[in-house]
Amino acid sequence: MATEQRPFHLVVFGASGFTGQFVTEEVAREQVDPERSSRLPWAVAGRSREKLQRVLEKAALKLGRPTLSSEVGIIICDIANPASLDEMAKQATVVPNCVGPYRFYGEPVIKACIENGASCIDISGEPQFLELMQLKYHEKAADKGVYIIGSSGFDSIPADLGVIYTRNKMNGTLTAVESFLTIHSGPEGLSIHDGTWKSAIYGFGDQSNLRKLRNASNLKPVPLVGPKLKRRWPISYCRELKGYSIPFMGSDVSVVRRTQRYLYENLEESPVQYAAYATVGGITSVIKLMFAGLFFLFFVRFGIGRQLLIKFPWFFSFGYFSKQGPTQKQIDAASFTLTFFGQGYSQGIGTDKNKPNIKICTQVKGPEAGYVATPIAMVQAAMTLLNDASHLPKAGGVFTPGAAFSKTKLIDRLNKHGIEFSVISSSEV
């Protein structure tokens, strides 16, 4: 991507927010990466100069770089002020947008970026927002030659690129994949900032509009290759992982399906069926999550119920979500494993009448998901936009990570930065 006309290659919008501060630290690390062959001019953006300055000072102290504050630009802008967003976008090649919930605050940033020739990356896990933005802005972004790429954090780069990695490693045709997410915690347990909780509340409370949006898009069904992937029960036992699992409620399924549609329609690649699950351990954890899920699904249906869920996240999530977010000790001790079980056909075997005769197991492993892996994924996606333009879709547009980055070296970048892709096993049946 052309960067020479703009003062900043990256502008981190929402840098003083809970997730934004971690993204800021990650860009600061990337700035001094010994493998960098060129300088990385960048800035932070938000409503308060004081807060932005404090974030830079905190990052400088943590990274041992006392001059960091003087090396990074500061841009004052506000979601409520479109002119200020325009000024920010004019100065950036890529805007990593950390301001959510995106259903409320994401569209003005996308609009400003498209109108002013900047690309934009977000870390939304909200299917309605992601799908609506593609419907509304894909052609406009393509006309401007800019890239708008959603869900470029833990939701949903590991899942989306994990399916592509699995397909690339199979010696044949991959037809179906199930993924199982396992979150590992240390002795102090897990905690997630309530911004993620709020996004889930608004998303579940607005399921009817998501269905209307999908019905209005009038998309033709993607061909079914191989046997139809059977859905598991809401609570099922995974023999391979020796634990119970539930359907994963994030954006992964929506994102992966959109990617597979793009790869089929634009690159003539065989579409892969996909289902996502999360492991929950033993029966005690299952019972605890059942109660939490029932509470959530009951209260999220009503306006006053949603207000209570938002006001008391720790209580209704059984301690998983809080307004304070995780401590540094909790972050340092946490990690994730995303395991993929795929099936398909060896070369020369027809997919219409025969049963799948190849199985493959792959994994994506990484550090704490929300505030370590997400910034790594977001920043490396941004660096891929800047440095691997020849392997991006030729025209701009609104893309999923897999659609945008399937031909790039993003997986190699992630491997070098601690999000590791590997093959566990592969065999003919």
From Swiss-Prot:
<keyword id="KW-0560">Oxidoreductase</keyword>
<protein>
    <recommendedName>
        <fullName>Saccharopine dehydrogenase-like oxidoreductase</fullName>
        <ecNumber>1.-.-.-</ecNumber>
    </recommendedName>
</protein>
<dbReference type="GO" id="GO:0005886">
    <property type="term" value="C:plasma membrane"/>
</dbReference>
<dbReference type="InterPro" id="IPR036291">
    <property type="entry name" value="NAD(P)-bd_dom_sf"/>
</dbReference>
<dbReference type="GO" id="GO:0005739">
    <property type="term" value="C:mitochondrion"/>
</dbReference>
<keyword id="KW-0597">Phosphoprotein</keyword>
<dbReference type="InterPro" id="IPR005097">
    <property type="entry name" value="Sacchrp_dh_NADP-bd"/>
</dbReference>
<dbReference type="Pfam" id="PF03435">
    <property type="entry name" value="Sacchrp_dh_NADP"/>
</dbReference>
<feature type="modified residue" description="N-acetylalanine">
    <location>
        <position position="2"/>
    </location>
</feature>
<feature type="modified residue" description="Phosphoserine">
    <location>
        <position position="217"/>
    </location>
</feature>
<keyword id="KW-0007">Acetylation</keyword>
<dbReference type="InterPro" id="IPR051276">
    <property type="entry name" value="Saccharopine_DH-like_oxidrdct"/>
</dbReference>
<dbReference type="GO" id="GO:0009247">
    <property type="term" value="P:glycolipid biosynthetic process"/>
</dbReference>
<dbReference type="GO" id="GO:0005811">
    <property type="term" value="C:lipid droplet"/>
</dbReference>
<comment type="similarity">
    <text>Belongs to the saccharopine dehydrogenase family.</text>
</comment>
<dbReference type="GO" id="GO:0016491">
    <property type="term" value="F:oxidoreductase activity"/>
</dbReference>
